[in-house]
Amino acid sequence: MIKSVIAGAVAMAVVSFGAYAAPTIPQGQGKVTFNGTVVDAPCGIDAQSADQSIDFGQVSKLFLENDGESQPKSFDIKLINCDITNFKKAAGGGGAKTGTVSLTFSGVPSGPQSDMLQTVGATNTAIVVTDPHGKRVKFDGATATGVSYLVDGDNTIHFTAAVRKDGSGNPVTEGAFSAVANFNLTYQ
């Protein structure tokens, strides 16, 4: 009997200890925000492609002044979950059926050269972007890049960018620079 009383007392002590335990105190907090846009298009744009940043690092003033271009930096526009059923077009006059996409870029052109994007930051530099077909992109918001053929699923469109002396005739100066270009897709 004494064993039963002792066992009961121990059980009560264990149960009551849990009732008097200190409440859990949060040790940090945060917030997660979810954003997106639903579009009426055959493809979505990968989130990392929709807002990109290209870092040219440090570029030689002397090299740019002598009409040089920085090392080209590659960037991609990734189209995801494409369903081109309603946009099919014969590719190259035969063979497989596929849809197409072209892009237009807009930004502040460097003077009359709409194929150079003006930089901000008094360095007298500009950005040039080359499309997948080796042609310079125009930043006029109207001139489309060459057509890229699409397949169902994911597609990647490759571009390169470089910094160079702008067309102002002013010498290249030291300092930080930046530029922003926006792109729009047109499917056919």
Swiss-Prot record:
Cited function: Fimbriae (also called pili), polar filaments radiating from the surface of the bacterium to a length of 0.5-1.5 micrometers and numbering 100-300 per cell, enable bacteria to colonize the epithelium of specific host organs.
Top-level division of the source organism's lineage: Bacteria
Stored Gene3D superfamilies: Fimbrial-type adhesion domain (2.60.40.1090)
Signal peptide from the UniProt entry: 1-21
Name of this protein: F7-2 fimbrial protein
Keyword Signal part of the UniProt annotation: yes
Protein family membership: Belongs to the fimbrial protein family.
Pfam families according to UniProt: Fimbrial
CC annotations in GO: pilus
Major localisation: other
Keywords in alphabetical order: Disulfide bond, Fimbrium, Signal
InterPro entries associated with the record: Adhesion_dom_fimbrial, Adhesion_dom_fimbrial_sf, Adhesion_dom_sf, Bact_Fimbrial_Adh_Pro
Compartments where found: Fimbrium
Example GO biological process: cell adhesion involved in single-species biofilm formation
Keyword hit for RNA-binding: no
Residue ranges the record marks as coiled coil: none
Cysteines joined through disulfide linkages: C43-C82
